[in-house]
Each structure stands twice: as C-alpha cells, then as structure tokens.
Amino acid sequence: SSGEELKCDTICVAIGLVPSIELVDAMGGKRSLDSERGGYVPSTDDTISMVGDCAGLIASGFDHIAYRMDWMRALAKVSEPGTIVCQCEEVTRADLIGVQPPNYLERPSPMKARSLETLLADGPPNQDQIKRLTRAGMGVCQGRRCRDQIAMLLAIEAGTAFGSVPHASHRAPVRPLPLKILADWEESGAMRDGWVVWFGIPTQWVPYRDIGTPREAEHQ
C-alpha cells in the first residue's frame, strides 16, 4: 500500500484456508456455504460430531470468500495465461477458460471450437463438466488444491457469485467405489505402462527403466 517496490524473481502465494469437508461430504452429510467460516462447511444434525478443519473455521465476521475472490481477480490481471491452475494435471488458466485438455493430451479440432464462452451460452458453469473437458481437478489431490480456485475463475468469467457454481464432486478414494468396478477393469498395454509415472503425465516423472537411456529426454 506504500508503493514500495521490491526486486524479486519468484513470488509464492498462499491465500486463506478452506475447510476440509471431503470425507463428511462423501458420506452424504449436508453442507452449506458460510463465507465467515471459510467456505463450504458441514451442516449436519447433532448426532454427528466433527472436530478440526472439517468443521469449518471459527466465525470471526471476516468474509473469506470475498477476500479470496478479490485476490483471484487481482492475480488474473497480473499473471500470464499460461499460469498453472491445476498442478496435478498441468492445466493452465488459458486451458481452463478455453476449455481445452492439458498439453499432454491431443487437442482435436472439435475441442478447439469450444470455449467457456460457448458453454456459458448453454447454461451456468459447472465444475464437473469442466473437469471432464479439461481434467482440471482430476489429479491425485482429487481437486483439494484447485477446486475452489477453479470455481472462483469460473464465477469471475461467468460474472456470477462463487456460490452459484456447483461444488465439484469428489474422486476415489474419497468417493467409495465397489470392488467389482476395479476387478472388471480392462487396461490397455499403454495404460499399464503409464502407471509407473505420475498418472501417465510424462513431464512430471521419469520411469525408472528410462533413466540413463535416450528415452529419458522425452520426459523433460
């Protein structure tokens, strides 16, 4: 606020806290949006007790959602379109707004014709739809690191309130899956080969068998 300028080459930003309601949510517990308690919080009856981050932050009269939305608008103005918004799947802000798959996947022509603007013409933004089209929130963190910021970006682009963007569904192992789904799964050879890297994303891990070989450069 003083106008002082500091020379630096890297800025690390961690803004606010978000209640960890995933397990309560996956068990079918009700939730409500409470900006003074950090965002979505459980709203179950007295027969269920919750302690810690899953119960929400202590209400202090501070509007956490408005604060984070202001930060997101400011960051969007000063950051490059190539800024990563989903670290696990390497989805950039441009990919999200353009509704494009991450760079490690092919981008067919029909996908290039779509964008968030065209989707908004069909209806309000939906995180689960965006997940399927861009893989934002589909990584091993199950959207824990990016779910709220993706919802904020969608709300800003749509010109709507944060709470109007549906809360994204959870992924396994938070979401229970019947064993028969895993037992009957038919994996291709290419899929089996991909399990030794970070969910098959070449730029994030180098398979042990490729270290010290010409194929190692393919993962850089």
Task: Describe the role of every protein-language-model region.
Residues 149-150, 182-220:
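Short flanking/linker segments adjacent to small metal-binding domains or redox-active Cys/His motifs
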Residues 1-134, 138-140, 144-186, 190, ...:
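Residues forming the flavin
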